[in-house]
Amino acid sequence: MNKLILISLIASLYQVEVDAHGYMTFPIARQRRCSAAGGNWYPVGGGGIQDPMCRAAYQNVFNKVLNSNGGDVIDASEAANYMYTQDNEYAALAGPDYTNICHIQQRVVPSYLCAAGASDWSIRPFGDKSGMDLPGSWTPTIIQLSDNQQSNVVMELEFCPTAVHDPSYYEVYITNPSFNVYTDNVVWANLDLIYNNTVTLRPKLPESTCAANSMVYRFEVSIPVRPSQFVLYVRWQRIDPVGEGFYNCVDMKFKYSEGPDEEDIIEPEYEVDNEAECFAYRTNSGNVNVNPLQENKYMAYANKAIRNINTHSNGCSRNRNNKNNYNKYYSKTYNYNQNRK
């Protein structure tokens, strides 16, 4: 009976209206895949979540908040569930300088990219979504290649807006060929820009999984073929003085007919469940055992990413090559915004 009361109390915390925004539905965003699968409400602590990485993400935040807040289970549950209930608000505010990509990389979302930079439960409304940034065997959307010699695949992506924000534009990045989803965090240093343009609302297709709107953002992107699992990083940026942007990690994998060369494939060096447990704090029979070694390792990854932003070949320094494109795009979007006033 006490468990039912606790679950009801936790669930009641979410019976409020939120300013909803959206998420990738094809390929599906990491956080949306987890929230759609469910299992996060019971039992407390995330034991009902079937997907090992979704469970690790939940437990990572749950135990972090639990250990920093004097063992408040309700607060820890609220924090962890926030990653699920707020799957349409993986967002950050850039202010009027939102076209400055170095500003985005250094100040707006410098780390925890899959969480849109949200890593502190005390900061609302974004909270702590950092569990979504754990390296590991995330379930990917698998795309069959029609030809094993393909270097690029043109795909139509779909973003489901739970609230429409126009004018706006999209950027799509892809992790570079050396990225290892099992051990590497998604950081700006290992991302390459492959798409940057405005996108208009269009009717959703019959096979769409977007239930929140009859209109979606659909746009074609030429995606470089990667021999191993990779991540698309999608930024949906509003054109307004507040500079609200939405950031989604999308796990993907291309399927070869005969398979790529073995030396090109990156495979995990560990059992998936064991590694997922290493990155999450452990909960056994209500007793929480902190694993500070792994937490320090994870934070070291994030801090290194921040330090490397200005110097890495794929960090801000590389964006001078795109400076003219950004300046040109800023002028276009600024004029568009002015004409709509």
UniProtKB/Swiss-Prot annotation:
Q: Which residues form the signal peptide?
A: 1-20
Q: Does the keyword Ribosomal protein apply?
A: no
SUPFAM superfamilies linked: E set domains
Give a yes or no for keyword Signal in this entry.
yes
Q: Which Pfam families match?
A: LPMO_10
InterPro entries, alphabetically? Cellulose/chitin-bd_N, GlcNAc_Chitin_IntDeg, Ig_E-set
Subunit-structure text = Homodimer; disulfide-linked.
UniProt function note: This protein is a spindle body protein.
**What is the recorded name of this protein?**
Spindolin
User: What is the source species?
Assistant: Choristoneura biennis entomopoxvirus (CbEPV)
